[in-house]
């Protein structure tokens, strides 16, 4: 993942605060850091770990370096004004807003995954198709969720194009990550042969983590819904989505003298919320969308989904082994994974220290840029 969309990692905890000063400021600062790394030596060091390490250097070093590039001068203008004007408390708040969420992602393991590129993320490339499977860790959900959201954002930009292979984006437990641009992907991906499949426990989870507006867009844009047992507002929402049907009601009145029968019609929920909230395991309700030339008469269903166990078994037997991308064993067969991951971590930190030293030396040697170091 090199130099694309890195500021999305800052969006996860603040998705409902877009436009807030202390939310936008760190995004701008981190975007400037990423842009610098793309410029510096043709992007040789433009990786997410390098960006984190550079951001965590002293701002007395980082600001002059970034400002020395005309392309980045406007990015840094608010920060330089605060620094030169002595607004140190404001400046500290802005910088901390960028450092704190990203500092949680500093780890040798994450640096290993997000540094060198073993493969490209255009998974539906006709010349080099891939299957990419990633998972979150419940113990570090917020940390890895930001990293996964960053990958998702980049993948969506690459696969949602014409002339690619058919592909699918399948996400289970969606609320555990922030997927920037998910609503747009659902709305536009179908024309580019990209299927989007989202799994989550309840609509309330989506509203909590994505905000009411974005959650509503996601819920109302999807064309196919499969649901097991859910309760509360989710059950009511699904019941309303499935619509109503005209049903007959018959009532019988009996007294001493006679017996009367009345029949009337009334619009009732096709699948009541009470029924959705009491579904047993294996029972599903849902709705499917059709195409113009492939009409589906029965779009709403309430049934048991039967799994063909024998077919699943045959499919599992035909699985191919996962290719080894990186071999952590040495010539003697010893596992050196920890050592190699730590060496990569140390290398990235050393490279950033050298970048800062070289850039400060360049600025010091340039009479037109020396003034940037006067306030250092």
Predicted regions: what is each one?
Residues 1-2:
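Short, low-complexity S/T/E/D/G/P-rich linear segments that nucleate or cap local secondary structure
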Residues 13, 186-188, 192-289:
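Conserved ATP-driven motor cores of ASCE-family P-loop NTPases powering translocation/secretion/packaging/pilus
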Residues 12-194, 209-210, 276-280, 288-295, ...:
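P-loop NTPase motor domains
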Residues 162-166, 198-201, 249-257, 313-321:
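A generic structural motif
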Residues 300-302:
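N-terminal charged/capping segments associated with class I S-adenosyl-L-methionine
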């Amino acid at each position: 993942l090199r130099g694309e969309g890195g500021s999305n990692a800052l969006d996860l905890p603040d998705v409902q605060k877009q436009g807030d000063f202390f939310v936008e400021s760190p995004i701008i600062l981190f975007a400037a850091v990423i842009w610098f790394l793309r410029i510096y030596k043709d992007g040789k060091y433009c990786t997410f770990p390098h960006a984190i390490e550079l951001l965590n250097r002293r701002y007395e070093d980082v600001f002059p370096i970034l400002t020395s590039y005309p392309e980045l001068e406007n990015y840094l203008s608010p920060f330089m004004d605060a620094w030169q004007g002595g607004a140190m408390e404001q400046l500290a708040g802005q910088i901390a807003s960028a450092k704190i969420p990203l500092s949680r992602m500093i780890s040798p393991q994450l640096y290993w995954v997000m540094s060198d590129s073993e493969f490209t993320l255009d998974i539906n490339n006709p010349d080099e198709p891939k299957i990419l499977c990633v998972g979150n860790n419940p113990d570090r959900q917020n940390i890895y969720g930001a990293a996964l959201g960053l990958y998702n954002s980049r993948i969506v930009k690459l696969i949602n194009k014409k002339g690619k292979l058919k592909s699918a984006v399948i996400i289970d437990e969606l609320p555990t990550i922030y997927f920037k641009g998910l609503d747009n992907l659902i709305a536009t991906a179908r024309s580019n042969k990209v299927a989007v499949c989202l799994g989550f426990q309840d609509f309330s989870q989506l509203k909590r983590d994505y905000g009411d507006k974005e959650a509503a867009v996601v819920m109302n844009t999807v064309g196919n819904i499969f649901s097991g047992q859910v309760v509360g507002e989710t059950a009511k929402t699904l019941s309303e989505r499935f619509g109503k049907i005209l049903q007959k009601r018959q009532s019988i009145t009996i007294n001493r003298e006679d017996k009367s029968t009345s029949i009337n019609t009334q619009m009732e929920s096709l699948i009541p919320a009470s029924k959705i909230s009491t579904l047993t395991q294996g029972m599903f309700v849902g709705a499917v969308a059709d195409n113009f030339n492939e009409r589906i008469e029965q779009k709403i269903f309430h049934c048991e989904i039967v799994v063909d166990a024998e077919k699943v078994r045959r499919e599992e037997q035909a699985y191919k082994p996962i290719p080894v991308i990186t071999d952590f064993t040495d010539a003697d067969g010893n596992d050196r994974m920890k050592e190699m991951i730590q060496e990569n971590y140390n290398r990235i930190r050393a490279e950033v220290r050298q970048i800062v030293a070289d850039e400060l030396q360049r600025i010091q040697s340039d009479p037109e840029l020396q003034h940037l170091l006067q306030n250092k």
